[in-house]
């Protein structure tokens, strides 16, 4: 087989066409902006189609093209499914001016009128149960395809689910996605067991599963299924169901809703790194059935399966699609039968927020994020790229981390149970519009060393014990990067796990968080593998 055969696809068309010029698009308006890039609505001149152009910002040009963008581009070009966002092409803008030496890059997506988060913020939008079932089936079909091809999304949330006025839902934002090494999930067997360590610097806090909060490194596709459960409940309530303002508060809300961990409902929880020094979280059964009592027993049953504390027994996408919830009246609506709504992107949502009733205060906490002028807006002073790559942290930061560890072990049980339950005991309780106005809670910031239980850097005795308990080699942590050629060693580093929280399909916003909530992982040199991507869609659950 000659090289020439790679230049044409199976239909004889050109396989690699390079980047389109930005002059091929007519800009129609701005949809949103954030730390990852700016997003514009545009019209393709060659065929008149409406597209979204996501401009990739180069905050540190000397570091080269952002690794998160490289990951997203590679995976999206390999994936092909009705419920997965399609990357049509890349566009380049070359400036003739002397002040701009490097071109600007744009990712070109089909235009989608909404993201799920925006629809839920629109006070004029109310989902019927048939509509919720339709969206859930499409979400589960997309995840079934992803997990069946050994891909973890790792940022499942309402803002990353795009919806068109034709009723089609698509999973977007693959900046944190990566292949996993284990076998794909099998019917009736959950997500299986992970055989290696992955970074815990993933998933937006409000949708983060308990095993990640407790620093489990050997996680599986079950982390995405927890996010599906959070989205499912959010569609019923019209607001995030677990909106914690810190990792500690997030765990409190989870345990108030689904019960505190025990060796029966979450075996091995006390051995996880995040539980060092914690003997118990009290003994509460949870009140999920009470919070969602208006949704009926079948919806509660599916929610219970999706929000299981034990990640080994959490339902996978294959089995979730077979749940009786989807075959009981009202049956799922067809996508084409769903109503259409006015556009709901970032700039549109600002108007919706002004229409919402007064709500409780926004979550508190430190602030880490990019300000409008590109600088770090943080309570702890400036933050540079060099700092994010430094494997050491200051003694002051370690001291604060130890205080956070003490909060887990020393805070009176009654106090956190009472505070966590206040948000959940009232089904009609409203969340502050500023929860969204200030952006969703962030993806984890650039890695720093985790210091809850130790002031030592890199591998401690605790880390070695953890690796031995779970049977894995030390330092075998997630550092997936796209398999591009070249000898640039910087491309072998996992630098892009969480520098920003994307606020939707095409864009993201600055966020507020404490950089002590997260741990430092040790990068390795693992290369990617391209799975066999084939679309397999079962439309059986839809109403005929």
Curated annotation (Swiss-Prot):
GO terms for cellular component: chromatin; nucleus; P-TEFb complex; P-TEFb-cap methyltransferase complex. SUPFAM superfamilies: Protein kinase-like (PK-like). Residues 374-403 have a biased composition (Polar residues). GO terms for molecular function: ATP binding; cyclin-dependent protein serine/threonine kinase activity; protein serine kinase activity; RNA polymerase II CTD heptapeptide repeat kinase activity. Keywords: ATP-binding, Kinase, Nucleotide-binding, Nucleus, Serine/threonine-protein kinase, Transferase. One of its GO terms (biological process) is transcription elongation by RNA polymerase II. This is Serine/threonine-protein kinase bur1. It comes from Emericella nidulans (strain FGSC A4 / ATCC 38163 / CBS 112.46 / NRRL 194 / M139).
């Amino acid at each position: 087989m000659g090289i020439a055969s790679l230049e044409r696809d199976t239909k004889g068309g050109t396989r690699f066409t390079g980047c389109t010029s930005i002059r091929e698009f007519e800009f129609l308006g701005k949809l949103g902006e954030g730390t990852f890039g700016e997003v514009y609505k545009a019209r393709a001149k060659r065929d008149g189609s409406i597209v979204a152009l996501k401009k990739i910002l180069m905050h540190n040009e000397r570091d080269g093209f952002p690794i998160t963008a490289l990951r997203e581009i590679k995976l999206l070009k390999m994936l092909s499914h009705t419920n997965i966002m399609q990357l049509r092409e890349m566009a380049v803008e070359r400036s003739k001016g002397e002040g701009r030496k490097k071109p600007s890059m744009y990712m070109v997506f089909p235009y989608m009128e909404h993201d799920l988060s925006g629809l839920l913020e629109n006070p004029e939008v109310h989902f019927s149960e048939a509509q919720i079932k339709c969206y859930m089936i499409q979400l589960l079909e997309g995840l079934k395809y992803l997990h069946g091809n050994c891909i973890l999304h790792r940022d499942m949330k309402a803002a990353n689910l795009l919806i068109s006025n034709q009723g089609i839902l698509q999973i977007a934002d693959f900046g944190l996605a990566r292949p996993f090494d284990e076998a794909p999930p099998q019917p009736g067997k959950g997500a299986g067991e992970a055989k290696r360590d992955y970074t815990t610097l993933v998933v937006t806090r409000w949708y983060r599963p308990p095993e990640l909060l407790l620093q489990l490194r050997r996680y599986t596709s079950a982390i995405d299924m927890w996010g599906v459960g959070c989205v499912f409940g959010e569609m019923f309530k019209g607001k995030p169901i677990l909106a914690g303002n810190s990792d500690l508060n997030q765990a409190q809300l989870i345990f108030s809703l689904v019960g505190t961990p025990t060796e029966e409902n979450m075996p091995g929880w006390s051995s996880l790194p995040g539980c060092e020094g914690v003997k118990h979280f009290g003994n509460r059964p949870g009140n999920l059935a009470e919070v969602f009592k208006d949704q009926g027993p079948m919806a509660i049953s599916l929610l219970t399966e999706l929000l299981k504390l034990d990640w080994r027994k959490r339902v996978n996408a294959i089995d979730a699609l077979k749940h009786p919830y989807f075959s009981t009246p009202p049956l799922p609506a067809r996508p084409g039968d769903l109503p259409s709504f006015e556009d709901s992107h970032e700039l549109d949502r600002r108007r919706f927020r002004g229409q919402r009733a007064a709500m409780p205060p926004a979550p508190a906490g430190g602030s880490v994020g990019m300000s409008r002028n590109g600088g770090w807006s943080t309570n702890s002073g400036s933050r540079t790229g060099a700092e994010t790559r430094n494997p050491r942290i200051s003694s002051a930061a370690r001291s604060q981390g130890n205080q956070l560890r003490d909060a887990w072990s020393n805070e009176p049980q009654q106090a956190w149970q009472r505070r966590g339950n206040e948000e959940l005991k009232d089904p009609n309780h409203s969340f502050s519009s500023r929860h969204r106005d200030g952006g969703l809670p962030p993806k984890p910031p650039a890695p720093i060393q985790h210091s809850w239980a130790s002031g030592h850097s890199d591998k401690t005795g605790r880390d070695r014990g953890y690796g031995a308990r779970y049977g894995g080699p030390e330092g075998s942590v997630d550092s997936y990067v796209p398999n591009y050629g070249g000898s640039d060693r910087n491309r072998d580093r996992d630098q892009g796990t969480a520098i920003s929280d994307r606020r939707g399909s095409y864009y993201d916003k600055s966020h507020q968080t404490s950089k002590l909530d997260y741990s430092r992982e040790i990068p390795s040199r693992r290369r990617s593998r391209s799975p066999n991507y084939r679309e397999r869609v079962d439309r059986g659950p839809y109403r005929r």
